[in-house]
């Protein structure tokens, strides 16, 4: 347990290191506002903080920098998030894929780090199906999921269906099967095909087949924006190994997906510092994440990935407001 003096010094050291990225010495801390301690006393307290694993001394400097453990204590017990107005443009209600891409770009532009959004899992349930004639015996099947995701598939048929038949098939599917999974629709169509006994039965079966394929892709899509922002971060630009590992992480996406999937199980903003998540074992990176909703149901996760030396108070604000903007845009999409 740290006493008030140690907490004050750790807070000042972390804030100073986040601000300029330079190891902080006792003389610098003695000049900090609110610290009325001699350099000798500060050195003694800093030695205690180092023994506790909260700060460390780079080999090239007499100053100290926070460790991941020090950042964690700072974030959990000393960080004050100012609720100052954060200027962020609204996310216009559009196609979900477009809104999600815009959210990732917004995260990266506001943070100047990397913005990440996990798109909602596609549902195998459909909300609406329509048919559009493209040419003779060539038709477009338009499938809308409950989340508003629109999938278009082209089918070729042996019969050149009329517009009236297309409308009839669409009406039958939407009135009888809306809200069911495509596999359920497929089975029910098989049992009812004898009853239907008309040309549109084959059309509906073809639509269900392509719809099942379109909506069965349950792989999470990770949208990443702003990777090049790390080139301007001294923590990475000065170390090619760190930079290479970071870009490998973004390219593979698997670890990011697992980490954000874990964070979706919690309410509010989550912070992962360095390798403490054990999913992304990268001491130089931190992740600030939050879930987002559609009509009150949690459907995905977003976040900012940047250096461990990041202004956590501002990142929390950015992630929180973007989560709310994305939830609003997806829920109010027409």
From Swiss-Prot:
GO terms for molecular function: DNA binding. Keywords: Repressor, Stress response, Transcription, Transcription regulation. InterPro entries: GAF-like_dom_sf, HrcA, HrcA_C, WH-like_DNA-bd_sf, WH_DNA-bd_sf, WHTH_HrcA_DNA-bd, WHTH_transcript_rep_HrcA_IDD. The keyword Repressor applies. Signal peptide: none annotated. GO terms for biological process: negative regulation of DNA-templated transcription. It comes from the Bacteria. Coiled coil: none annotated. Belongs to the HrcA family. PANTHER family: HEAT-INDUCIBLE TRANSCRIPTION REPRESSOR HRCA. NCBIfam families: hrcA (TIGR00331). Negative regulator of class I heat shock genes (grpE-dnaK-dnaJ and groELS operons). Prevents heat-shock induction of these operons. This is Heat-inducible transcription repressor HrcA. The lineage of its organism: Bacteria, Pseudomonadati, Pseudomonadota, Betaproteobacteria, Burkholderiales. The gene is hrcA.
């Amino acid at each position: 347990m740290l006493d008030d003096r140690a907490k004050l010094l750790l807070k000042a050291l972390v804030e100073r290191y986040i601000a300029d990225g330079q190891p902080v010495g006792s003389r610098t801390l003695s000049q900090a506002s609110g610290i009325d301690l001699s350099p000798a006393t500060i050195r003694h307290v800093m030695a205690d903080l180092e023994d506790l694993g909260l700060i460390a001394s780079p080999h090239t400097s007499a100053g100290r920098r926070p460790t991941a453990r020090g950042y964690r204590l700072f974030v959990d017990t000393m960080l004050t998030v100012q609720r100052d107005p954060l200027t962020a443009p609204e996310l216009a209600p559009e196609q979900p894929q477009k809104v999600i891409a815009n959210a990732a770009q917004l995260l990266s532009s506001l943070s100047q780090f990397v913005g990440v959004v996990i798109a909602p899992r596609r549902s195998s349930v459909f909300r609406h199906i329509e048919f559009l004639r493209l040419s003779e015996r060539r038709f477009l099947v338009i499938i809308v999921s409950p989340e508003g995701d629109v999938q278009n598939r082209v089918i070729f048929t042996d019969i050149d269906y009329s517009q009236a038949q297309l409308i009839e098939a669409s009406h039958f599917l939407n009135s009888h099967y809306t809200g069911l999974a495509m596999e359920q629709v497929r089975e029910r169509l098989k049992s009812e095909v004898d009853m239907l006994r008309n040309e549109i039965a084959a059309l509906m079966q073809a639509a269900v087949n392509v719809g099942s394929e379109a909506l069965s892709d349950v792989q999470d899509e990770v949208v990443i924006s702003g990777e090049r922002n790390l080139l301007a971060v001294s923590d990475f630009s000065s170390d090619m190994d760190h930079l290479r590992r970071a870009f490998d992480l973004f390219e593979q996406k698997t670890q990011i997906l697992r980490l954000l999937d874990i964070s979706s199980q919690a309410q509010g903003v989550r912070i992962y510092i360095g390798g403490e998540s054990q999913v992304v074992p990268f001491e130089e990176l931190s992740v600030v994440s939050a879930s987002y909703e559609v009509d009150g149901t949690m459907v995905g996760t977003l976040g900012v990935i940047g250096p461990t030396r990041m202004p956590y108070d501002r990142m929390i604000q950015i992630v929180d407001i973007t989560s709310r903007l994305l939830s609003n845009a997806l829920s109010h999409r027409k």
